[in-house]
Curated annotation (Swiss-Prot):
Gene3D superfamilies: Transcriptional coactivator/pterin dehydratase. This is Putative pterin-4-alpha-carbinolamine dehydratase. It comes from the Bacteria. Keywords: Lyase. It comes from Shewanella piezotolerans (strain WP3 / JCM 13877). The keyword Translocase does not apply. The keyword Lyase applies. One of its GO terms (molecular function) is 4-alpha-hydroxytetrahydrobiopterin dehydratase activity. NCBIfam families: PRK00823.1-1.
């Protein structure tokens, strides 16, 4: 388990700062299987998880839903046959907060 996966999310208000470029570089290295995407001008973290069938993909999605509820931070999730695409960003600040990196790392632990 990574250091990030052991951290707790903090409340993220609309005036919370987005991660700086320096922080972004450091945090991205801690979650190497994730990519940074920009959609509609909003920076987001994304990863595609592969599974052998739809049932396993759905089971992972349900575990992720439980994690998101427990941490009060919710991703974009696209569940398809054999894969789940997970996208993290902080809606309130329209960009990336440290919480998104924490949740990406925690999402990776669901495979263990």
């Amino acid at each position: 388990m990574t250091e990030l996966a052991q951290m707790k999310c903090e409340a993220c208000q609309a005036d919370a700062p987005k991660v700086s470029d320096a922080e972004l570089g450091e945090l991205v290295r801690m979650i190497p299987d994730w990519t940074v995407e920009v959609r509609d001008g909003i920076m987001q973290l994304e990863r595609v998880y592969k599974f052998k069938n739809f049932k396993l993909a759905m089971a992972f999605t349900n575990k992720l839903a439980d994690l998101a509820e427990a941490d009060f931070h919710h991703p974009g999730i696209l569940t398809e046959w054999g894969k789940v695409t997970v996208t993290w960003w902080s809606h309130s600040i329209k960009g990336l907060h440290k919480n998104d990196f924490i949740m990406a790392a925690k999402t990776d632990t669901l495979l263990d």
